[in-house]
Amino acid sequence: MKEILVNAEMQEKRAAIVKDGVLDEYYIERPSYKTIVGNIYKGRIDSIVPSIGAAFVEIGLEKKGFLYLSDIVEPIEPIAQVETKKREFKKGEEVLVQVVKESISTKGPRLTTHIGLAGRYLVLMPQDDHRGLSRRIEDRQERSRLLGLLEEIKLPTDIGYIIRTVAEGKDKRQLHHDVLFLFKLWRRISSFAQRNTAPALIYEDYDIVLRVIRDSFDDEVSKLIVDSKEEFKRICNFLKVFSRDLLKNIELHRGRLELFTEKSIEKQVDKIYERNVYLKSGAYLVIEPTEGLVVIDVNSGRFRKKYDPEHMAFAVNCEAAGEIARQLRLRDLGGIIVIDFIDMEREDHRREVLKILKNSLKDDKAKYEIIGISKFGVVEMTRERVYRAIESLSYETCPYCRGRGKVKSSATMCVFVLKELKRTLTEHPDKRDIQVSLNPNLLNYLLKENEEYIKTLERRYRTKISFTLEPNAHIEEVKII
């Protein structure tokens, strides 16, 4: 059973896609952070860098947008039948762009001039003549039928589209309704863009809740449960426009417990941020995201079944492959991903593990590419990350360790304190009183290991060294005055 749960509060909105009680996808949005992916801006070319084949575009945000020159097409009139072609832009020129990737770290948002307007059943591309279908529609007859229906609707030849997965099984009337809605939207966008000067926000895409409903609420979802009356009404109004037949599947949560708690989802959400992911067999994954790549290590842990080493490795890796695909979706991990499976001698076992991983990734909405599996069980893959990582919305860099995950040891800090004491006394030989403020644990270690040496310094430099305890001080925070 597949459900969508929506938790809407003043401070944040959350959406969870749950399959048979297991959290499969999780989204969060706050007033302080709203995604800009899908937004359309009228921007101004700020600079062009031929060496990287890109332009930086001023769109009115903190960071300038990044636009590959290969992503530039000739602007066209609203719904006009004119030839679409690539051309060069000049500094200071205005351009209509859409955000396709969130600003991450020091990088600005990724932009394109290939505008895509997502409806219920298709994505309209008014400045592009590309036409295609979702790769998840696999039946050839259905693919042919859908393309035929769009031909009957007779879209202008220069207007592109992509038929979405949810269009599977839909009739001409439903598709035509979507086309009319998107054409009307594009006319509004074009008109607004013509009346405004850059930089300007021209169109703001739906918030995270309505995006999830638009992209994931289909006949396979048995229920959409919402815990807010206001949000319930808003979603109903949205569905009346996009898909009335799904209104019967929406439900207002009236339980005593909070929705995510009652559905046993809150604890699963907390586990998204953990480094270790434990599997039912007793094996576990270690997930290490870094600035440049993500490393996932598979460990046998307390694997309970009695197999020989080869079959044990195969069984653990098969279980891990499916869970890894789920974790990539849940955490929205992207970039280069290296998966270190347990070594397997047999080639057929390696192929089967890779097959399970690929099958488990089929429902992933993000673009991905799997390079293969080596004889050492290492899989290299890439996965597109469009939004900011879930973790970055809920956590910030630890001010104590400054994001390292480690602090200097007491032994290291003791050496530092003694060196600083000696340096201070050498530079100020007439100083008769030295005050040292430091962490209590560090002081205990310092006196336990070096009390005699400190007394030696006092005698040699004819001074008094006093210590002040600072219970809230960082272990690396030492003051000598």
PLM features per residue range, with description:
Residues Y26-I28, S32-S51, Q81-S103, R143-L149, ...:
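Phosphate-interacting basic helix/loop segments used at nucleotide- and nucleic-acid interfaces
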Residues K91-V95, T197-A198, N249, L293, ...:
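Loop/turn-to-beta-strand initiation segments
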Residues K2-I4, D24-T35, P78-R87, I104-T112, ...:
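Active-site phosphate-binding and catalytic loops of NTP-dependent enzymes
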Residues E74-I76, L111-G119, Q141, K240-K248:
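A short alpha->loop->secondary-structure connector
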Residues R131-E266, Y273, I390-I481:
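Charged, low-complexity intrinsically disordered tails
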Residues G53-A55, K63, E102-M125, L182, ...:
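Conserved glycine-centered short motifs in functionally critical loops
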Residues N237-K267, K271-N276, K280-E319:
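Metal-dependent catalytic core segments for phosphate chemistry
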Residues M1-T112:
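Charged, low-complexity terminal tails
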